[in-house]
């Protein structure tokens, strides 16, 4: 088999790297090793700065728009908010060019943003007032319904209590009559003299201390008969 040689590929690779390193200082453009290192580093920087460039331009556009808006008596954030509410599809690049090159047309955009912000605030206040009125009406309705429900509950509870009382009275009446019927009558003749004197004192018999037992018994019978 024939021997394979990598010299053509190696030469192409070296020429490619040295071509990319053309214009570098010193050995970075002549020697392959240092040129390759510098090219790899340069490619990384280029990848990073392609993205950083977009950020830098956005900062520049915002600073130009802010400067133009401050000259017209408005902030950048309020200007962009007003244009968004007005549904103006103009990007920051165009606005920055207008603020830098055509300040009169840029002032018209600022005026449009101011008017839309005023209209938005008015509509927002109207909606707030309507919402507060609705909340007041709803709170009043809730309070009325709560009062009605509380009154209904009180009525129901009072009716239930009256029914329970009537049922309890009907149930207890025969028991009371039975107890009264079963209540034994006092046998005064079998009681002792001090017990009779206590009863006489309770029933307010006059001069019970001077009376005899038979007299106290007769007086107590008369007092109990009156009751």
UniProtKB/Swiss-Prot annotation:
Pfam families: Rho_N (PF07498), Ribosomal_L20 (PF00453). It comes from the Bacteria. The keyword rRNA-binding applies. Keywords: Ribonucleoprotein, Ribosomal protein, RNA-binding, rRNA-binding. NCBIfam families: PRK14537.1, rplT_bact. Binds directly to 23S ribosomal RNA and is necessary for the in vitro assembly process of the 50S ribosomal subunit. It is not involved in the protein synthesizing functions of that subunit. Belongs to the bacterial ribosomal protein bL20 family. This is Large ribosomal subunit protein bL20. The gene is rplT.
